[in-house]
Amino acid sequence: MGKKLGVLAAAIAVAALVVGVAIPAAGSSGQASKDRTFRVTATVTEVSQIDLGAPGPSLGDEIVFSGPLLQGGHQVGHQGAVGTTVSLQRHEAQFIATYSFSGGQITAQALVILGSAAPYEVAITGGTGKYEGAKGEIDVLPATATNPNGILTFHLQD
């Protein structure tokens, strides 16, 4: 059970991709390169854990989750992610996530320390629609025992 809670906390943290900043429009061509930054509150409403191999923590164990992305209490998108345990010694999982907004999606991935409450960065690996060719990073403020939602600050580079 402790493993499941740690993995769920990591999932919510990764999901934690808050308020008052609108989702940016697509950059127009011909303008100088600039950074676009926005924040969302990430919630997890569906989650499933797959315990592979021997019962308990083992390489290849997975967690799959999804949920809405919010700004100012309003849903502005949704997320889906898969985390796979890649190191028992380092308590690491490889997470791959997609964040879907009106007009496009942003993909991201990172190695995450399972159960850690420390903030961390996630690499933006691409996008579609108005986020086509997206690059940059996401600063993650993980969920905690007192705040079940995480905060994601997207830093998109044109």
Question: What positions do the PLM features span?
Answer:
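Intrinsically disordered, low-complexity sequence elements enriched in Ser/Thr/Gly/Pro
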Residues: 1-2, 15, 34-37
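Beta-strand-enriched cores of mature, soluble protein domains
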Residues: 29-158
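Sec-dependent N-terminal signal peptides
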Residues: 3-18, 22
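Residue-identity detector for glycine
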Residues: 2, 6, 27-30
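C-terminal region of N-terminal signal peptides and the immediate post-cleavage residues
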Residues: 18-34
